[in-house]
């Protein structure tokens, strides 16, 4: 049986990276929320 998590840095960056977050309004909202919370890392 194939497992659900098949790590790939390329897919990780494309789906959850900073540029992907900035591309949508909802993504920018996530970044702002993480900044407000004082997160050390904002995105993958």
Curated annotation (Swiss-Prot):
Gene Ontology terms: biological process: translation
Pfam families, alphabetized = Ribosomal_L34 (PF00468)
- Extract the InterPro entries matched here: Ribosomal_bL34 (IPR000271), Ribosomal_bL34_CS (IPR020939)
**Gene Ontology MF term list:** structural constituent of ribosome
Which Gene Ontology terms of cellular component type are present?
ribonucleoprotein complex; ribosome
What are the entry keywords? Ribonucleoprotein, Ribosomal protein
Entries under PANTHER family matching the protein:
LARGE RIBOSOMAL SUBUNIT PROTEIN BL34M, MITOCHONDRIAL RIBOSOMAL PROTEIN 34 FAMILY MEMBER
Q: Which HAMAP family match?
A: Ribosomal_bL34
What family is reported? Answer: Belongs to the bacterial ribosomal protein bL34 family.
Protein name, entry field: Large ribosomal subunit protein bL34
């Amino acid at each position: 049986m194939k497992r659900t998590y098949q790590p790939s840095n390329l897919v990780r960056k494309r789906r959850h990276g900073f540029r992907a977050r900035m591309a949508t309004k909802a993504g920018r909202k996530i970044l702002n929320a993480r900044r407000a919370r004082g997160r050390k890392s904002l995105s993958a």
